[in-house]
């Protein structure tokens, strides 16, 4: 079932992780600590860079986040792959939000560029995905370009993020 809300708080995201937002067998977010954002600030089926829809989210950076003590000892940095995973998570959420059925899985991405780091000194990470295409066939496939901003500065870019929703065969 397509959603009508355009923003989601942390409790909504936890409901999605439990499979309660889009219904049984449909798109879910991972549960913490792998849930990589605290809120979805805006989602729309229209607009964005390509006019096919977009989603925006934020993560509040706290020095005690689980990855800082181990990546790296004495030099804490958020792993870049977690920022990339957040963009895949958002793309899957977008497909579920559209009302598309199936369980979400990251498939691939094109080019990824990192030009900065998320350290404990950062206050807020903003994420964005602009959808280029949603294909509906044996699976539902979302393709988009994404970015990550640390305190307003764009430091990650990813092109051609691909997420599929797969229906379970009986």
Curated annotation (Swiss-Prot):
Keywords: Cytoplasm, Fatty acid biosynthesis, Fatty acid metabolism, Isomerase, Lipid biosynthesis, Lipid metabolism, Lyase. It is found in: Cytoplasm. Its main location: cytoplasm. Its EC number is 4.2.1.59, 5.3.3.14. InterPro entries: FabA, FabA_FabZ, HotDog_dom_sf. The keyword Membrane does not apply. GO terms for biological process: unsaturated fatty acid biosynthetic process. GO terms for cellular component: cytoplasm. It holds the Pfam family FabA. Pathway: Lipid metabolism; fatty acid biosynthesis. The active site is at 71. Necessary for the introduction of cis unsaturation into fatty acids. Catalyzes the dehydration of (3R)-3-hydroxydecanoyl-ACP to E-(2)-decenoyl-ACP and then its isomerization to Z-(3)-decenoyl-ACP. Can catalyze the dehydratase reaction for beta-hydroxyacyl-ACPs with saturated chain lengths up to 16:0, being most active on intermediate chain length. HAMAP family: FabA. Belongs to the thioester dehydratase family. FabA subfamily. This is 3-hydroxydecanoyl-[acyl-carrier-protein] dehydratase. It comes from Chelativorans sp. (strain BNC1). The gene is fabA.
